[in-house]
A protein has these predicted regions:
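Feature captures hydrophobic
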Residues: 1-148
Length: 148
């Protein structure tokens, strides 16, 4: 039953109405993105593997303000990647893509909002250098393309 619900949530074209469904949907997207980028690296995706090979030990994260259970991360170190759920606890992430609300996160994750406009408006906060936000954003799009 849980897998069926997750499947229907991830294939939805409109954001859900109920707050608990929004929370679940954003969590599923965050887990899909972190795991997807890691799996593309492990399976030899040329662009992502090159990026991971050159990377020092860094953590990239996704989070929503005031939603401590809605977060995920990917650790990248010398060609290896590891996706994780929740907040990375050993150190502050090198870069965090943080959203001001579940609705803002869904706007970006479902492709109905503009990343630059949301950044200007404060709905998307990039903790770290913006060029890394663009890079992670491009990898998010790759995972999204494969997922569809």
């Amino acid at each position: 039953m849980a897998l069926l619900k997750m499947s229907s949530i991830l294939t939805a074209k409109e954001p859900p109405e109920k707050e608990e469904d929004k929370r679940l949907m954003v969590k599923c997207y965050f887990y899909l993105l972190s795991s997807g980028i890691s799996q593309l690296n492990k399976n030899g995706h040329e662009e992502i593997h090159e990026w991971a090979k050159k990377s020092p030990d860094r953590v990239y994260a996704w989070a929503v303000n005031d939603e401590p259970t809605v977060s995920a991360y990917i650790r990248v170190k010398a060609g290896k990647t590891r996706a994780g759920r929740g907040t990375y606890k050993r150190a502050l992430p090198f870069f965090t893509m943080r959203f001001d609300s579940l609705d803002s996160a869904l706007g970006i994750l479902m492709g109905t909002a503009d990343m630059l406009e949301f950044t200007k408006g404060g709905q998307l906060i990039m903790d770290g250098a913006p060029e890394f936000g663009a890079q992670i954003g491009a990898y998010m799009m790759m995972v999204g393309d494969y997922a569809q």
